[in-house]
């Protein structure tokens, strides 16, 4: 069972009890039968009259943040459970992240957050193959419109092709989600903006960057976001755009998880936004016009 903690936290039409009932052995109880190795060739009468119990299943649960709640774990009817944690030898803390993951933090005023993101896409970092997470579907939708308006203005002014930016959310049909993920895997999508729906249980092998446009509220959500990159030994980068009023909470969260020392802080000098500003203002005006028409 992958993403075990998420599945345990939701009923999903009582899937746990339904599955486990189907997996239970149907033979006699272990307490009433001798193990198979005790039978001999002469014990044909015993073989005919007494059934050897069928073997039970082996249950393997995988998650980056597996629950330790006894009530939830007991629902799985585990026998002699063993807990195995995989991490780097020197790593401490409750959460383990791969050594090939590079974590970055940019502290910015709220009104400059989009400019910081645009600078990451068109500045020195030149970020592509990125997942960009927002706090909600509405926030993701608004950000995508703003980025698309900017790309259109930027392409007209610079004669450069616009970035391919798309919106991924629970509002899309399943077929549309699959089509969008295939396009990302083929390199046809530069930035995929989404809420936390995609952060768990979806395997995208070529995610180079994860951007938390809105920082997560807890460490478990942070781990599942950044876990979309640096997979299977690949190198990946996780970027967090932290508003000034969020710095204390964000740094404390990382510190308690033993990750603060691994994060690199970046600072963008004020003049770096100058080439972006005219096109950003034009995009803002178009966004305001769009939302005024929808009211």
Language model region names:
Residues 82-87, 129-131, 151-171, 191:
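Conserved RecA-like helicase motor-core motifs
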Residues 133-138, 165-178, 195-200, 243:
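Conserved helicase motor
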Residues 1, 5-91:
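Post-DEXD/H (motif II) to motif III coupling segment of the RecA-like Helicase ATP-binding lobe
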Residues 193-210, 224-234:
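SF2 helicase motor core recognition
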Residues 69-79, 94, 144, 197, ...:
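Short regulatory helix/loop adjacent to the ATP-binding pocket of P-loop NTPases
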């Amino acid at each position: 069972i992958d993403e075990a903690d998420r599945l345990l936290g939701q009923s999903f039409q009582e899937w746990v009890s339904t599955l486990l009932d189907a997996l239970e052995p149907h033979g006699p109880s272990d307490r009433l039968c001798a193990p198979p190795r005790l039978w001999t060739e002469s014990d044909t009468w015993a073989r005919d009259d007494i059934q050897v119990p069928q073997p039970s299943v082996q249950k393997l649960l995988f998650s980056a943040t597996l629950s330790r709640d006894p009530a939830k774990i007991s629902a799985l009817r585990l026998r002699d459970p063993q807990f195995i944690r995989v991490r780097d030898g020197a790593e401490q803390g409750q959460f383990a992240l791969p050594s090939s993951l590079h974590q970055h933090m940019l502290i910015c005023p709220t009104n400059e957050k989009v400019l910081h993101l645009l600078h990451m896409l068109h500045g020195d970092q030149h970020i592509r193959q990125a997942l960009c997470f927002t706090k909600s579907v509405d926030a993701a939708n608004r950000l995508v419109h703003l980025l698309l308006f900017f790309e259109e203005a930027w392409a007209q002014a610079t004669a450069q092709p616009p970035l391919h930016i798309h919106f991924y959310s629970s509002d899309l049909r399943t077929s549309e989600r699959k089509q969008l993920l295939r396009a990302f895997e083929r390199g046809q999508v530069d930035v995929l903006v989404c809420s936390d729906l995609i952060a768990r249980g979806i395997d995208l092998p070529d995610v180079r960057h994860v951007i938390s446009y809105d920082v997560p509220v807890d460490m478990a959500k942070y781990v599942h976001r950044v876990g979309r990159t640096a997979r299977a030994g690949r190198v990946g980068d996780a970027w967090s755009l932290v508003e000034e009023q969020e710095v204390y909470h964000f740094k404390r969260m990382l510190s308690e998880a033993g990750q603060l020392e691994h994060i690199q802080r970046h600072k963008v000098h004020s003049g770096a936004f100058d080439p972006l500003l005219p096109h950003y203002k034009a995009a803002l005006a178009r966004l305001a016009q769009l939302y005024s028409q929808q009211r």
